[in-house]
A protein has these predicted regions:
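Non-catalytic DNA-recognition/assembly elements of restriction-modification systems
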Residues: 1-59, 73-81, 173-213
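Short alpha-helix capping/helix-loop boundary micro-motifs
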Residues: 85-92
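Glycine-rich catalytic cores of cysteine/serine-nucleophile enzymes that process amide/ester linkages
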Residues: 70
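Glycine/Thr-rich phosphate-binding loops of Rossmann-like dinucleotide-binding domains
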Residues: 83-84, 112
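A short glycine-rich beta-alpha junction/loop motif
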Residues: 1-6, 119-125, 155-179, 185
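Short coil/turn segments at secondary-structure boundaries
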Residues: 58-67, 151-154
């Protein structure tokens, strides 16, 4: 049993845990900052943001591990842990980059994430907005203001659907430049931390593969 691999896996696990703690603290701070935004006069959110729905490629096109020329296929479950467990061959499907905001309206309405790169499924929408508003929009999406609207308009028994709630979204005006810049800075830090997290998980998997060879 190569003890150096075991030690390395433990060290990577520690780094993943520490990184996750930092992510949660930054998200909490960003949410606290956003809670200071004046919500007494909200505007139609659809004037500032839009949503691009992903595509279902079919399970016949899934790969359970990364192969040559493949790209991650992101499903609703991946938004929870920011991990990749399914891959596909890129055939000009709907794509997202690390700095895109992804949100689910089917299955787990309101669940969202950033820091993922690949092809995204039909249960997920990519948020389209001005890059200067990414931080504001991200923390708006995670606020009670929006999550409550999604929750109240989720329909279905076995699988919840909430895409019809999009037209009801109300968003505070972006009139505090300093606050907007602060939220954008936090957003960019989160993107880098999530990218680091994915890299650490890949390293861990490589070490595990080496250990079990």
């Amino acid at each position: 049993m190569p003890i150096n691999i075991v030690d390395s896996i433990g060290s990577v696990d520690d780094a993943i845990e520490k990184n996750e703690e930092i992510i949660e603290k930054i998200k909490a701070y960003g949410n606290k900052l956003f809670s200071t935004v004046d919500t007494s006069q909200c505007i139609d959110a659809n004037t500032l943001i839009s949503f691009e729905k992903g595509i279902e490629i079919g399970s016949a096109n899934y790969y359970d591990k990364e192969i040559e020329n493949s790209t991650p296929y992101i499903r609703v479950g991946n938004l929870l842990n920011n991990n990749y467990d399914t891959y596909c061959i890129d055939n000009d499907y709907k794509k997202c980059d690390y700095n895109d905001i992804l949100i689910a309206f089917d299955g787990a309405p309101g669940r969202n994430s950033i820091g993922l790169c690949g092809v995204y499924s039909s249960g997920i929408y990519k948020v389209i907005c001005d890059s200067k508003l990414k931080g504001f929009v991200y923390f708006y999406i995670n606020s009670d203001l929006l999550q409550d609207i999604i929750k109240q308009n989720s329909q279905g028994t076995t699988i919840l659907h909430a895409s019809k709630s999009i037209k009801l979204f109300k968003m505070p005006s972006v009139n505090n430049i300093i606050l907007n810049n602060q939220l954008n800075d936090l957003y960019n830090v989160l993107i880098n931390l999530y990218k680091k997290q994915i890299s650490l998980k890949k390293i861990k998997q490589l070490l595990l593969n080496k250990y079990f060879d």
